[in-house]
Amino acid sequence: MTNDVIRIVVCGDEGVGKSSLITSLIKDTYVPNIQKLLPPITIPKGFSSSPDAPLSTVIVDTQFSNSPAEAEHLHREIRQANVIWLVYSDHYSCERVSIFWLPYFRNLGVNLPIVLCANVFDDVDSWNSRDSERIISDEMIPILREFKEIESCIRVSAKLNHNINQAFYLCQKAVMHPIAPLFDAKEGKLKPNAVAALQRVFFLSDRDQDGYLSDQEMLELQVKCFGRSFDATDLIQIRAQLAKINPALATERGVSEEGFITLNRLYADKGRHETTWGILRTFHYTDYLSLSDQFLYPKLDVPENSSVELSPEGYRFLVDLFLLFDKDNDGGLNDSELKTLFKPTPGIPQKWLDFNFPYTTVHDEQGSITLQGWLALWSMTTFLDYKTTMAYLAYLGFEGDNSKKRFSGSSVTVAMTTAAAAAARLTAFKVTKPKKRRSRPRPYYRATPNDRSVFNCFVLGSHMSGKTSLLEAFLNRPLMTDIYKPTIRPVSVVNSVEMTGGKQCYMVMEELGQQEAAVLSNAARLEECDVICYTYDSSDPNSFSYIDGLRRKYPVLDTLPCVFVALKADNDRQQQRFDLQPDEYTKQIRIAAPLHVSSKWPSSVTELFIQLAEAAQQPGRGLPNQDPEEETNTIMPFALAGGATVLLAAAVAWIFKNVRVAGRE
């Protein structure tokens, strides 16, 4: 519930007992002589025994008049209300409910829940008579069917002080636990948004993903949502009730998803929808059956020039998810398993589809995403758009320590507030230190990043130089055809790279296609790039000149580390029609000679990706036109300072020793 204060406006014809009802509620007894119109009354939280009660409830008494001023006052009060307590007392005022009052509320344009109250029974004997059922059937049910804004109806007596507290609770309940978002009374079934929300609750509660909530899982859900356990008889009754409707809803394995939905439909149908709301709010749903932006996207402070990566906790959660949904234990998630995994989410992330999923990362021969590819995809998504990962972790139920218990088999019996759950999700991420630049006579260049494990590489080169083949080789896939197809849209792939010494990082490689000029002119996009892979076709004499043209057109590229690569090295090498041959060219700009690579030589491909990763991690070594000593020169002042300190300390020690010797003599 988002209302800290509930405002109840009491409406009805003159003389139906509105003021008497309010007085009896406050005094807990009937007061015969009261003023015609009571002032607004504030009732504190402690007045109600419900743990979900608002901080305060304001009850506003009203009267209807043809006076323009009083009519405007009534309009204003109704527009400020959270719920309307509509009272009638006899046949005439009952007729006025459907003829005047309910159309009047609609004409005002308000969409408020209404509690219909019959304040007519002052004879004690009448409460137990059959007339009671007849009155409900004849008077109230037709109105309920015609006007869906009526949440509930109740018979009360101000004189006997009967059912007034219950009527007040129904008004609070109409705001705290509204039936309208959940249940379609005319159709007698839950609304689609309610079904979707409950399906997500079922998904997150079905810890072993067998399609049923076992007794243990039902108990854990009950304790998590309401802080108390079921009795054994309660579970038996629930199962029996569902099995009576359809045996498939509750079997020996537990309650099925359809059975769980049916159970909540029964709650709503019987006026126990506060139970359903208790479940939904535990899983952070708003009154509109959505997950709020505050929950999906908690604030994460990311300094300028910093990036966001997954933390060990985030990777662990994603590994656990992969293993849970790899039902056939073949080491890959097929289409069916992916569909099941993403069921509680909006679907496969749009970012993945934009990058031509599933061809963006590593998959097996059957097209199933491997664990390596799964983690690489999320690493790329987090690096490029961490808010997407943040939202999907929310949909999939990441809650810090609670997530560890969920996969380890421990009971998850502590519900987290929406704010706490959002804050716990931040533990799935780490923010890297801001990218720094070192100054030198030429343009700035980036300092060595020492806390990053995800890097971005732009693959640049002439048409037909082999860029697409290189990206396919990065994913350990052969090129499907030798027929050249120009890359139109940008293509991104991601995979892990194991470097010398066993350290692993993730590399996102982008071929820019026809958007190359736009990307290279965009400072923000260039800031995302950590290393450039300049490619040329070693068997095409006109291929290399394209690289020099790019560097001249976009001088800013020289502020990024780069690796030159001669592709198609298995073909006969041709002299390049350019002023300098590639080896001479790279020597002139003081970087390593081109690496000769062929997709038919796996070891050469592996070596290239290692060099790209190392260039991204140590950008000073791959920058064009840098003197060899410049990278080490940045350390020299500290080394000299350290050496001077050591010499000074030695000199002081020598002087101190000689002074002591002289003193003794």
Curated annotation (Swiss-Prot):
One Gene Ontology cellular component: mitochondrial outer membrane
Cytoplasmic-side positions: 1-634
Mitochondrial intermembrane side: 656-665
Major localization class: mitochondrion
Keywords from the UniProt entry: Calcium, GTP-binding, Hydrolase, Membrane, Metal-binding, Mitochondrion, Mitochondrion outer membrane, Nucleotide-binding, Repeat, Transmembrane, Transmembrane helix
Enzyme Commission numbers on file: 3.6.5.-
Positions of GTP 2 binding: 461-468, 498-502, 567-570
Enzyme class: hydrolase
SUPFAM superfamilies membership: EF-hand (SSF47473), P-loop containing nucleoside triphosphate hydrolases (SSF52540)
Residues reported in the UniProt entry to bind GTP 1: 12-19, 61-67, 119-122
Molecular function GO terms recorded: calcium ion binding; GTP binding; GTPase activity
Binding positions (Ca(2+) 2): 326, 328, 330, 337
Residues binding Ca(2+) 1, per UniProt: 206, 208, 210, 212, 217
Pfam families noted in UniProt: EF_assoc_1, EF_assoc_2, Ras
InterPro entries: EF-hand-dom_pair, EF_Hand_1_Ca_BS, EF_hand_assoc_1, EF_hand_assoc_2, EF_hand_dom, Miro, Miro-EF-hand_domain, MIRO_dom
Entry keyword annotation includes S-adenosyl-L-methionine: no
Gene Ontology biological process terms in this record: heme transport; mitochondrion inheritance; mitochondrion organization; mitochondrion-endoplasmic reticulum membrane tethering; phospholipid homeostasis; regulation of mitochondrion organization
Record domain EF-hand: where: 193-228, 313-348
Membrane topology: Single-pass type IV membrane protein
Segments forming domain Miro: 3-177, 452-618
Localization of this protein: Mitochondrion outer membrane
Function in brief: Mitochondrial GTPase involved in mitochondrial trafficking. Probably involved in control of anterograde transport of mitochondria and their subcellular distribution.
Protein name: Mitochondrial Rho GTPase 1
Organism: Yarrowia lipolytica (strain CLIB 122 / E 150) (Yeast)
Taxonomic classification: Eukaryota, Fungi, Dikarya, Ascomycota, Saccharomycotina
